Amino acid sequence: MRSYPLSEADKIVACLTPDYGLIRLVAKGARKIKSRFSGSIEPFSVGEIAFYRREDAELGILRSIELKQSYFHLAKNVNMVAALAYFGELLADFSPPHEPNENLYRMARACFKAVAGVSDDQNKMGAGVLYFELWILRLTGYLPASNVCGECRSPIRPDESVVWSSENRFLCELCAPVGRGIILKPQQAVLLSLARKLAPEAFIAQSVYKREFLKPHSAITRKLIKQVLLRDLEYWSEKNWEAVEL
């Protein structure tokens, strides 16, 4: 997901794996010009790794990596780099070290691939970012169900508005405080249902026709993420949404 200097010659590489969760490995000699890791440990690369780590150690040793897929060619697209770096930041924050989560790994790979395929389309990129936010919150247990009222527990009908309250719950119209919270009208709330049912590519394709609805949902995910992490996000932020045509 990312790498950073450890010493004059070495780097620390953060990797998300299906079997070991988030791991941090020392790539010895990676900062040297003729490093055997040259070009293979760039951010967002996909590959098969061999490593060694003692059970009680925070860092392991990267033995080798066989590169399967690289997104390095996207580095010239500033907004794309911001989106993918944002994915990496969220994964680093929401993935406990050494705790496997295959669903999270598969979701992350699917989203990286989907967003990398939208080129310079800002609307599609924004939809992909929203999908990733919704799913990382859902898979880590922070996103409540949007089809059931968090107060009265009644099902929320497809023709009914949904309100996101300050208590981080989705409420039906009857339980929601008047004039408070983020209101999602029925045609807006449908995006939450689509995100649950569709793969990222299909969600992006559907959302491009509902792009005016992306910002309210993003406001919800950003508020929730900020409350969970207790800090503002570094990469993809409101400035990136300003580029999305609404």
Regions found by a protein language model. Name each.
Residues M1-I12, L16-L246:
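Non-catalytic alpha-helical scaffolds and adjoining flexible linkers that form interface surfaces
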